Amino acid sequence: MSAYANKRFLVIDDLPLARESLRAIAQSVGAFAVEFASNYQDALYRIRNNTPDVILCDYMLGDGRSGQQLLEELRRFGLLSDDTIFMMVTGEQAYEQVVAAVELVPDDYIIKPFSPDKLLLRLDRISAKKKFFAGYYREKRRQDYAAALAVLARNKEDEAGRPYRFEILRQEAEAHLASGNAGAAEAAYRSILTDYEFPWARAGVARSLHRQNRHVEARAEIEQVVAGTPSYFDAADLKASICMAQGEHAEAQRVLDEVARKTPRNFLRKRLLAEAATLNGDAETARAALADVIANDSMPGAVSPADQLALARSQVAAGDSIAAEKVLLGLRESEVKGFDLALQASYVALLALTSPERGAPRLAGLRPALLDTELPTDTRIDVLRAALAGADAELAERQARSLMAGPEAKKVFALLRKAYTLHGRDADLREIQRQVALERIHHEPTAGAGPAAA
Amino acid sequence: MHRLLDILASGVHDAKNQLFAAESMIATAEKAHGVDLGEARYAIEAAAGRLSRTLTTYRLLRHGASLAVVPTVVADLCEEVLLAQAKQLERAGVRLGLACSVLDEWPLDRDLVGDILNNAVQNAGRHARSRVELSAVLEGGDLVLRVEDDGPGFADPSTAAAGGTGLLVGERLAALHVRRGRSGALLLCNGGRLGGAVFELRLP
């Protein structure tokens, strides 16, 4: 009896002939239960409801979707268990170029036509590999990164790990990055690069530098990747994020515009585009992108209150208070009560901007908390705008100071200036800027002591 | 220029889907009736391989061709060549041996290198008396993949590469594998361990 007799297979392909062929091959390796999915949504639905053991997914799914996008979405929502085998099936070389470049790869990919024997060989190898990394996956899932790294260190010494030496290094880098140790991740990616110039490893260096707020270096690294592998869209996303951190919002939007056009149904990218457009002052593009996300990102739970707030924010920026108010009031009161402080603050600040009589009293209620709590950047900007509109100079100044002193100062400076200019208070912002700069100089000797002593 | 490549690629893609359908029907029939139709499946795979290779040749011989380099387990790559070719060679009375002493992963274009090795083994099988051997070893920091046979050898190894498309692609493919400033090479000679033709792909 075949080792795959009791396994549940899912075949994903939009073409009936190809689907039938994949099923026949799966059955000839002994698979008893073979299910079909004919499109992206159907595949997501089946995988969510009853995760198969083996997924054979064609790279081209039609309707502007690809198997790679499905894989990314499954990982993003944690819908693939560690034991599930995801095998990409491809008829042409386009996918090989993708898999050679990207960070997120399937367990394997196979080129049509292939014999049942070849499929069996590949499945057996994937199973062996999963078994080898089982201990690591377990710790990673529990987010115990120290333990996960300890397992990898043992794997490295293990003779059985020799066929996986790049995979071990790659996982090591990812675990460092996930645990927040961007410096160690950078070193791990660089050690891969001394062996071979993989685009995903170069992008990993850029990502690690970006996390360390070393944006100029990160930018140089990612430009190299984007130039060398134009089909590596995640690299373009990363480049855009770095550009935003550097305050180069027009370039960020240009890059995202270009890749978003090639991947019209990638809604994470659309959100990023909206962020760049907002920072770039192009409220119309931001609004269109977010409306598309909210209407079409059909993954259950994918559209979050944060998306609704982002849409309202872009409408406020576009000067369309009525539409923004409609979005905000569309959120149920019970839902708003369940928000954390940051989301609540954004909600009431945006409401205060669109409908002062409703929003201002609620903003006043949150005011004490907002004066001395750490808040995310988006929220700070919302609060700052509402405070300026409500002539609450102290609340506005508190937000502006934190933003100017923080790592995202370059990213948000243009927005801050615009907000202050709108209320004719440029002088206030210049004064805040001066004070933050003075404080920075004041703190420099202590900040510089580390490297100097070393 | 890119447009022409897209048209060719899409035609090859469709044809391969059809061939895959044919292969899967044969596999179903084999299972249902307990027969071995391996030869028919082999012919289908060979046709698909030929189509791919034609496209690859066109792609690689243009300017600006790029590889898809992935970490590849060398032993697995060799094993797949064995799986694809051993039975067919056996039918012609030729035994295909495998000797792989490389345990690690190697950065290479898995599918193109696999294709070139399949092609080399097929060629060797046509000229061998009774044996073909595929081997993988590390030599001076290079991965060396060799296909040797016990046939009469190349008439003139120095001009052999100009004769066949497969060899031409092999040369280009080897040259495109660049690592730490060094590039790969394709070498042809006579002699070797089996006394016949030797096809050697060296990858840095």
What are these model-predicted stretches?
Chain B
Residues 3-7, 19-49:
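Histidine phosphotransfer helical core of two-component systems
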Residues 38-92:
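Conserved DHp (HisKA) dimerization/phosphotransfer helix of two-component histidine kinases, i.e.
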Residues 95-104:
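Conserved catalytic submotifs in the C-terminal HATPase_c
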Residues 116, 120:
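Hydrophobic residues in the alpha-helical elements that line and stabilize the ATP-binding pocket
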Residues 123-125:
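Short helix-loop "hinge" at the ATP-lid/N-box region of the Bergerat-fold HATPase_c
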Residues 131-141:
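Short beta-strand/loop element within the Bergerat-fold HATPase_c
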Residues 146-168:
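Glycine-rich/acidic phosphate-handling loop/turn and adjacent ATP-lid/helix
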Residues 176-192:
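Glycine-rich ATP-binding loops of the HATPase_c
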